Amino acid sequence: MTVIEEAWVAPMAGPPSQDDIAAIEACVRDYYEGWFAGDGERMARAVHPALAKRAFAQDRDRTPTLDETSADEMIDGAAAGAGRARAGTRLDIRIAEIGGGIASVNASTDHYVDLLHLIKTPDGWQIINALWRWADGHGPRA
């Protein structure tokens, strides 16, 4: 039995609802598809105002860097079309865990790999944390 299965059958808790699973997948789709389509409204729906998006990587000179992006920067970047050049890519979504109003999702495209944490708010599921890296063969050093 995996940790996820144990969490799903813990006393007083049941498996995640199909509605929650669908809503989490829709949130992640809004995040990526909003980015690729230049749709700031979809991005705004997907990210929590307190979003902490980070990437730990190396710049062109191999200097370690920490890149941080806010919810406003993601929304404005999407609306400005910053992700359109990478549109049409595949999107793989794997929900790793759901419980107690939080979820963990592994998502990837041809260009990005993200570890996402979501919270269930009165407005629905939203991404509160995102740790990302470039997919193999992409990014500034590709």
Where are these regions (language model features)?
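Short, low-complexity N-terminal intrinsically disordered segments enriched in polar/charged residues
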Residues: 1-41, 45-50, 61, 66-68, ...
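Short beta-strand edge/turn micro-motifs at domain boundaries
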Residues: 2-3, 104-106, 113-139
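Residue-identity detector for glycine
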Residues: 14, 34, 38-40, 77, ...
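Surface-exposed, charged secondary-structure patches
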Residues: 20-23, 52-112
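Compositionally biased, intrinsically disordered low-complexity regions enriched in proline and serine
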Residues: 32-33, 57, 113, 126
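Solvent-exposed, well-ordered amphipathic alpha-helical segments
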Residues: 35-36, 46, 73-75, 88-91, ...
